[in-house]
């Protein structure tokens, strides 16, 4: 039998340690939520990304009449690399402008929008793929990445009204069953973002359980992955662009 003092200590630990761990968990995810829904500038260690942001602003000034603007993380940027053939086949003829940036979180994109990324532009459609890096880089919850998308859509709506500009939100293309990524995807699919905002489930065009067929690392699309999702996205863009007004 344990002495009474040891029993008391054990009881104290059993009562207080879970509460303390719970408080730490809550504080950690509250901070990650803050990073997701508020503008997050690039750090001094992210000089290459800051230079990419400056180049994107220059590209925006050079293409002020682009009818479709692609925003988001590496899946967007790599459309011009691994998916180059698909981009040149389907989206270059439409005059689309791609300002996607690798490693970008929702907070980073909010900061870029605040910093005038889209100031010279008046696109009829914004295509958004953001939040994956919140889960990967910041280890956030799926719900947190979803709230980051809500904040981005709200910010875009401050810049462009629903009467002039549509928004397409693309949920995560690759998500394992039961993962935080799947939670993120489901949150986007179930949410009503409001007037003229469309959630487009392009992951349905990547059938099968073997992600390696469509990716080169289990997350980022390869050429085949981009070839699979480009035609349905192109058709939806055409459908929206054919409307005389929204």
Please give the residue ranges for each predicted region.
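Catalytic His-Asp segment of secreted/periplasmic serine-dependent ester chemistry enzymes
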Residues: 173-246
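Active-site flanking residues adjacent to catalytic metal/cofactor-binding acidic residues
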Residues: 71-73, 130, 200
């Amino acid at each position: 039998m344990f002495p009474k003092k040891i029993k008391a200590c054990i009881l104290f630990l059993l009562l207080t340690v879970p509460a303390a761990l719970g408080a730490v968990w809550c504080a950690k995810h509250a901070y990650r939520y803050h990073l997701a829904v508020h503008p997050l500038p690039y750090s001094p260690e992210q000089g290459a990304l800051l230079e990419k942001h400056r180049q994107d602003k220059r590209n925006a000034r050079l293409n002020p009449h682009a009818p479709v603007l692609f925003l988001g993380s590496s899946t967007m940027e790599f459309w011009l690399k691994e998916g180059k053939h698909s981009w040149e086949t389907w989206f270059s003829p439409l005059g689309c402008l791609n300002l996607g940036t690798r490693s970008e979180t929702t907070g980073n994109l909010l900061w870029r929008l605040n910093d005038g990324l889209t100031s010279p532009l008046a696109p009829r459609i914004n295509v958004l793929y953001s939040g994956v890096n919140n889960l990967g880089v910041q280890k956030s919850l799926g719900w947190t990445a979803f709230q980051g998308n809500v904040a981005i859509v709200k910010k875009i709506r401050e810049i462009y009204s629903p009467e002039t500009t549509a928004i397409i939100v693309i949920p995560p293309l690759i998500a394992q069953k039961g993962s935080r990524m799947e939670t993120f995807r489901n949150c986007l699919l179930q949410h009503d973002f409001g007037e003229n905002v469309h959630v487009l489930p392009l992951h349905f065009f990547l059938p099968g359980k073997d992600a390696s067929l469509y990716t080169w690392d289990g997350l980022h699309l390869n050429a085949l992955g981009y070839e699979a999702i480009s035609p349905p996205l192109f058709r939806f863009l055409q459908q929206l662009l054919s409307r005389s007004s929204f």
